[in-house]
């Protein structure tokens, strides 16, 4: 009952904040034997491109249309990539998706399929294939289970097993504290240095990138979190897991409007019960100087390195107040009314 009330409390809090703030087998239409795929391949170049290639033929007419689609995560949305080919009974088609730095999460499984149509009206849709968008600068190791996968390099097998244990512990912690559980396995990608991870992150501006060290980043649309093996790695992991779980809870039309203070504040609240850390000290100092943020101004993250500690401390303080002081009851009523 307590966990259910807590879960509804989180739902209510979210709603309140939003209101106030190989050659694949084939599926065919028409003549099932008219179109045949003789080759289908995919390659990736990290932070540069994804390249797909197809060879196909039709016994019924000229192949007039070839489309390439890819998807990831829960697979509910497919993305189309323009193809290049010359129509004919036998075609070779290519499709290239440029990948900007940080656009895709590293070590991501990308599923893709082709849809081919000939002049006789036959359409073939291939079964999905998978290509890994790999950060090919490193030799990756991998371990996991049905709830999470951990990928790392430069450390022993025991490191990966420990990280997987932390991941499961963090997921259990979220379920016990808030009654919420991820609907898909978490993918944890661990880098060994800031320089190593920088190429996997989207640039945020020269000042921020130079002055701040990003210990972790949740890529909720990919079901992936990136983190550094530095400092208190378990705390970083739990923080980023909170982002994945919260975005999984509210995914849909409201997700893009989730205020940053709630997203980050809940992650800070979940990562540690320690209320006497550097973030709290930064916030206390800002309160004494009357230099805190308005909650409305915290709907987007703060990009000033000297203000980061205050911002995170204040986000946690707001969430702690809403959850601890008001508990699940008031928020539960909001959740029941709107879910």
PLM regions and their residue ranges:
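Juxtacatalytic substrate-recognition/specificity segment
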Residues: 139-259, 289-292, 300-307, 311
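Glycan-association/targeting regions that enable binding to alpha-glucans and other polysaccharides
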Residues: 22-141, 146-149
């Amino acid at each position: 009952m307590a966990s259910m009330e807590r879960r509804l409390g989180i739902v209510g809090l979210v709603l309140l904040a939003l209101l106030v703030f190989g050659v694949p087998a084939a599926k065919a239409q028409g003549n099932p034997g008219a179109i045949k795929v003789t080759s289908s391949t995919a390659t990736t170049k990290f932070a540069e491109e994804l390249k797909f290639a197809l060879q196909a033929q039709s016994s019924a007419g000229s192949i007039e249309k070839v489309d390439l689609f890819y998807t990831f995560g829960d697979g509910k949305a497919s993305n189309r990539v323009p193809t290049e080919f010359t129509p004919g009974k036998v075609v070779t088609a290519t499709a290239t998706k440029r990948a900007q730095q940080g656009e895709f999460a590293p070590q991501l499984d990308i599923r893709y399929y082709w849809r081919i149509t000939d002049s006789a009206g036959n359409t073939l849709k291939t079964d999905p294939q998978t290509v890994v968008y790999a950060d090919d600068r490193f030799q990756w190791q991998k371990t996991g289970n049905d709830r999470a996968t951990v990928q790392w390099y430069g450390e022993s097998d025991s490191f990966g097993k420990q990280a997987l244990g932390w991941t499961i512990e963090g997921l259990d912690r979220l379920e016990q504290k808030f009654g919420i559980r991820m609907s898909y396995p978490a993918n944890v990608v661990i880098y060994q240095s800031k320089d190593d991870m920088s190429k996997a992150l989207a640039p945020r501006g020269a000042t921020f990138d130079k002055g701040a060290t990003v210990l972790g980043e949740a890529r909720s649309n990919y079901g992936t979190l990136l983190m550094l093996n530095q400092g208190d790695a378990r705390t970083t992991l739990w923080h980023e897991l909170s982002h994945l779980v919260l975005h999984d809870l509210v995914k849909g039309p409201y997700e893009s409007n989730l205020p940053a203070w709630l997203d980050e504040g809940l992650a800070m609240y979940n990562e540690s019960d320690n209320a006497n850390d550097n973030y709290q000290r930064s916030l206390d100092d800002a309160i004494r100087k009357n230099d805190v943020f308005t909650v409305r101004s915290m709907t987007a993250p703060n990009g000033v390195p000297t203000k980061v500690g205050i911002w995170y401390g204040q986000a946690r303080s707001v969430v702690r107040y809403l959850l601890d002081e008001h508990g699940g009851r008031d928020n539960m009523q909001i959740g029941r009314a709107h879910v």
